[in-house]
Amino acid sequence: MADTLGIHGESVTQAVRGAVFLCDAETLIGKADLKKFELTAEKVELTASGSESAKTFYNMGHMSNDTLPEFSLDGGDATNLSTWLEASFRTSYNETTGKVTFSSVQGDKTTLKTIYNAVDMPDNVGIAFGLVKTPVAKSVLILWQDTNTGERSALLLPNLDLAFSNLPSLSTDKFTEYGMEGSIKTSKKLPKDASGKYCSVAIFDTADFKAV
């Protein structure tokens, strides 16, 4: 039976609370594992599939409540092409690139090493990192929950080049923030779209978290 549009009030959500999970690049999440993702889950071990060993998504913990994850697209401008016979005969779109930014407020060593791709100091006190960014490919799940209804939704970026966006952002009236940014790439693990091109993003709606 084909899907049809309709009124689905249970899918109207507010991102009241949320979490960001990291895993190895090109890791997808199946139906049986999706419901394991809770805001306070320290980690979620996925079910092993075929010859692949089980992968684990790790919760980044406390993220900024002031600087929520933000997505941006560059390019994708439309061009209308006309024929001599007919105006606006065809529309084409320029190539589009995507980016996501989010900020952690946890300043523990493990989190900072992940954000800044840092190394331990010689005496194991403190960490060090360069200002030249070296992106690390990750699969990133951004989970949000409407605490008024308990409904969860999520967005998966299976192939994200992740790096720090800036040095720590200090404040006297809110938590110190450690920003990250990621370039969204296509994933060969995701299905192809209707035009035969690889996809870059997967979205899980409220019903997906209840699927059996």
Give the ranges of each region predicted by the language model.
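Short helix-loop boundary/capping segments
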Residues: 108-159
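Polar/acidic, low-complexity leader/linker segments enriched in S/T/G and N/D
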Residues: 1-61
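Beta-strand-rich interaction surfaces with strong enrichment in secreted/lumenal proteins
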Residues: 88-90, 144, 168-170
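Beta-strand elements of well-folded, non-transmembrane domains
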Residues: 77, 104-108, 144-148, 161, ...
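Short secondary-structure capping micro-motifs at structural edges
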Residues: 82-92, 99, 119-131
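Oligomerization/assembly interface segments of phage tail-like spikes and tubes
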Residues: 89-112, 173-188
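Mixed-charge, glycine-accented linear interaction segment located at domain edges/termini
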Residues: 154-212
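A glycine-rich, hydrophobic loop/mini-helix early in the fold
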Residues: 47-97
